[in-house]
Amino acid sequence: MAFVSAWFLLGGLGHFVFTDFFVGIVPPYVPWPLAAVWVSGVFELLGAAALLVPAWRRLAACGLFILTLCMTPANLYMWQHPDLFPSFPPTLLAARLALQAFLLGCILALMLARDEAPLARR
């Protein structure tokens, strides 16, 4: 859970610190790329925080799973058009896709995890 929360905290902040980069990887068929970057950044930050609240963890994981699926086209776009991203070696672009699959698996595990047993009352 800490890995997923940290991933989305850093990624969400990145949407605002490196906005131009993230806008640049939005596929051309996605309308309003700047808005898409800002909105996804906000949802990443909200999801990262919500994962830390046990009562919200499963809902946050569901939201982050859907968000990650929605962002997959950006990673696919980079992988399919390496000439547009010459500073990224093709192997790194492929590794990003593998990492995204791993991340989806981690999020799915959070969605399916049983809730921790509540503390016994005294």
Predicted regions located by residue number:
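Membrane-interface extramembranous regions
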Residues: 1-122
